[in-house]
Curated annotation (Swiss-Prot):
UniProt-listed Pfam families: peroxidase
InterPro entries xrefs: Catalase_peroxidase, Haem_peroxidase, Haem_peroxidase_sf, Peroxidases_AS, Peroxidases_heam-ligand_BS
Top-level taxon: Bacteria
Cofactor: heme b
Source organism: Burkholderia multivorans (strain ATCC 17616 / 249)
Listed GO biological process terms: cellular response to hydrogen peroxide; hydrogen peroxide catabolic process
Residues that coordinate or bind heme b: 259
Reaction catalysis annotation: H2O2 + AH2 = A + 2 H2O; 2 H2O2 = O2 + 2 H2O
Protein name: Catalase-peroxidase
Keyword GTP-binding included in the entry's annotation: no
Cross-link Tryptophyl-tyrosyl-methioninium (Tyr-Met) (with W-91), where in sequence: 218-244
MF GO annotations: catalase activity; heme binding; metal ion binding
Keyword Heme listed: yes
Entry GO CC: cytosol
């Protein structure tokens, strides 16, 4: 018998087999409770925007300029300048952004956390962040990691002679990883033919993904699945960059501009490289990819496995990238690490060595670089940029600014003296308020007019929800401000029931015009404000019908955007393909409807209780799109009761599938078999899922009516104001 002592802490909290291991298909409510105050070390009254305003940004930039050329022995700078490394760091911080759901991007400084800190494509960026630590330490809470990573990329460009378009701070840090779907693969860089491939059919990339392989930011620089075919690579580039909100011109500018600087690293075999940061030994203190090849750094560094320097001036802005791209013919070769790359035929050695000034190399390129020459559309743009360097510089400056600010939302969130004055269409601009706002007396009068207009509670609530619920907490886009629900493309979305929406908006516009025409002091109400106010009036009336007097908070200040201020193509990605709050599915998806509800709730920054109370309220207010009966578990539609929960939890009702795919269910009286209700997966999950049932029981209790109404109003008000950054 063994006498070895047993560890008394073998069963520590969080260890062992998890619920997810036992029931992998169970919906994940944890995504609704990320980034709470429980994980935030800052004081409760800490306001990052105010802290950033106290920052001496010029001093930070001076320190960053000095850092660029202060090479450290533990990680030496290529060519004596860290610019290329820091550009890559900033690019990869922002480059995870994808337009399909707005997730990823530079906001929050997620590059510090798993899995991003350990993606193969982010190899050795841990060193870049450690180089920055003395500056972050010096300025502390006045600049977030999220802002510092992007600022450093900007300063890197400026220190090498490039004039940037501008810079905005305003990205508060997060303190734990986002819960983002990055793909189903279980192996880093798994090829497209793998068992969990993100591709189907004719290389159709799964939504909402944008990168071509697990662990890459964009595309495989060697070509699709490592196949060195520049034309095939162009297809991947175009698809991936489009999914990251970039058109062809922006794509060419970004690739060529970024590859004007620095180099890649592939001095030796990948077998010499140790584990990534999350798998590295404790004593490495969060650093990964420790290499045993030579010195493991400097001339011996291994990152991507590619060994390419694009220009003869890797620490200075130039047009060399295009000069080399078009001046040479290219032959396929391999890096010292064995990766596919290209070298200029019959070329002189004009490229400096990163560490030995006596050495020169022939120009080299990546497969994805050559795509800019051999794809017909990219070639036209590349040649124009080659012939017109000023156009190239302007395009790169604008594309870099877009890349690094795309997930920040409206300009009202931009902070600092370097914010550019120019308003850009992709920022979803709205006009500034240029008139007196309505007061409490006006608000009461407008509510009365709306309620007397003939519009139903359902119409008022549905329209306000449709307007506000486009908001995405991921990239801060959408929301009620701008009243874009009256513009293309939103006015034509199926989920908004265009014909009924047009009639509602026409009525509300009549109320708005009558009010504005009656004013003598310039006071006006915008349609954006009136839509939200009308929704508040509907909720108050529905609560009154239930015997509960309540006032829905309302803060005027929204304005109406024009069609010219609206990028129809960019706005189209906000169209809901699923909105469980309205019991809407555009089509059948592999992902269950209840999981899509949770995903929508997470984009709306809702907690599980807020999601629960909103669904229960929306059902009894009759806001369904499609079948008006599913989930409307009440005999009093239009009345804000807790009937949804009471009737869902009633054990006298037996539920059975009513469709072959188990998407619709019938609830029948257990004793008589009489049909009482019909519901969807979204409805029934509140009785099936143990956590959601616990919440439903709170609102389904006999003493819950008052609490239900007040909680609904609070959650409703939150959604209506998600885009009101001016109120924060």
């Amino acid at each position: 018998m063994s006498t070895e002592p047993k560890c008394p802490f073998h069963h520590t909290a969080g260890s062992g087999t998890s619920n997810k291991d036992w029931w992998p298909n169970q919906i994940n409510l944890n995504i609704l409770h990320r980034h709470s105050s429980l994980s935030d070390p800052m004081d409760k009254d800490f306001n990052y925007a105010e802290a950033f305003k106290q920052l001496d940004l010029a001093a930070v930039k001076r320190d960053l300029h000095a850092l660029m050329t202060t090479s450290q022995d533990w990680w030496p700078a290529d060519f004596g300048h860290y610019g290329g490394l820091f550009i890559r760091m900033a690019w990869h911080s922002a480059g995870t952004y994808r337009i399909a759901d707005g997730r990823g991007g530079a906001g929050g400084g997620q590059q510090r956390f798993a899995p991003l800190n350990s993606w193969p494509d982010n190899a050795n960026l841990d060193k870049a962040r450690r180089l920055l630590w003395p500056i972050k330490q010096k300025y502390g809470r006045n600049i977030s990691w999220a802002d510092l990573l992007i600022l450093t990329g900007n300063v890197a460009l400026e220190s090498m002679g490039f004039k940037t378009f501008g810079y905005a701070g305003g990205r508060p840090d997060t303190w734990e990883p986002d819960d983002v779907y990055w793909g189903s693969e279980k192996i880093w860089l798994e090829l497209s033919g793998g068992p969990n491939s993100r591709y189907s059919g004719n290389r159709e990339l799964e939504n909402p993904l944008a990168a071509v392989q697990m662990g890459l930011i964009y595309v495989n620089p060697e070509g699709p699945d490592g196949n060195p075919d520049p034309v095939a690579a162009a297809r991947d580039i175009r698809e991936t960059f489009a999914r990251m909100a970039m058109n062809d011109e922006e794509t060419v500018a970004l690739i060529a501009g970024g590859h004007t600087f620095g180099k890649t690293h592939g001095a030796g075999p990948a077998s010499s490289v140790g584990p990534e940061p999350e798998a590295a030994a404790l004593e490495q203190q969060g650093l990964g990819w420790q290499s045993t090849f030579g010195t493991g750094k400097g001339k011996d560094a291994i990152t991507s496995g590619l060994e390419v320097t694009w220009t003869s001036t890797p620490t200075k802005w130039s047009n060399d990238f295009f000069k080399h791209l078009f001046s040479y013919e290219w032959e396929l070769t391999k890096s010292p690490a064995g990766a596919h790359q290209w070298v200029a035929k019959d070329a002189e050695a004009v490229i400096p060595d990163a560490f030995d000034p006596s050495k020169k190399h022939r120009p080299t390129m990546l497969t994805t670089d050559l795509a800019l020459r051999f794809d017909p559309e990219y070639e036209k743009i590349s040649r124009r940029f080659y012939e017109h360097p000023d156009q190239f510089a302007d395009a790169f400056a604008r594309a870099w600014f877009k890349l690094t600010h795309r997930d920040m939302g409206p300009r009202s969130r931009y902070l600092g003296p370097d914010v550019p004055a120019e308003e850009l269409l992709w920022q979803d601009p709205v006009p500034a308020v240029d008139h007196p706002l309505i007061d409490e007396a006006d608000i009461a009068a407008l509510k009365a007019k709306v309620l007397a207009s003939g519009l139903s509670v359902s119409q008022l609530v549905s329209t306000a929800w449709a307007s506000a619920s486009t908001f995405r907490g991921s990239d801060k886009r959408g929301g009620a401000n701008g009243a874009r629900i009256r513009l293309a493309p939103q006015k034509d979305w199926e989920v908004n029931r265009p014909a009924e929406l047009a009639a509602v908006l026409e009525t509300l516009e009549g109320v708005r015009k009558a009010f504005n025409d009656a004013q003598t002091g310039g006071k006006r109400v915008s349609l954006a404000d009136l839509i939200v106010l009308a929704g508040a009036a509907g909720v108050e009336q529905a609560a009154k019908n239930a015997g509960v007097a309540v006032t829905v908070p309302f803060a005027p200040g929204r304005t109406d955007a024009s069609q010219e201020q609206t990028d129809v193509h960019a706005m189209a990605v906000l169209e809901p393909v699923a909105d469980g709050f309205r019991n809407y599915l555009k089509r059948k998806f592999k992902t269950p409807a209840e999981a899509l509800l949770v995903d929508k709730a997470q984009l709306l920054t809702l907690t599980a209780p807020e999601m629960t109370v909103l669904v229960g309220g929306m059902r009894v207010l009759g806001t369904n799109v499609g079948d008006p009966k599913h989930g409307v578990f009440t005999e009093r539609p239009g009345t804000l009761t807790n009937d949804f929960f009471v009737n869902l939890l009633d054990m006298r009702t037996e539920w059975k599938p009513a469709s072959a795919d188990n998407d619709v269910f019938e609830g029948r009286d257990r004793a008589t078999g009489e049909l009482k209700w019909t519901g969807t997966r979204v409805d029934l999950v509140f009785g099936s899922h143990s956590q959601l049932r616990a919440l439903a029981e709170v609102y389904g209790s006999a003493d819950a009516q008052q609490k239900f109404v007040h909680d609904f109003v609070a959650a409703w008000n939150k959604v209506m104001n998600l885009d009101r950054f001016d109120l924060v």
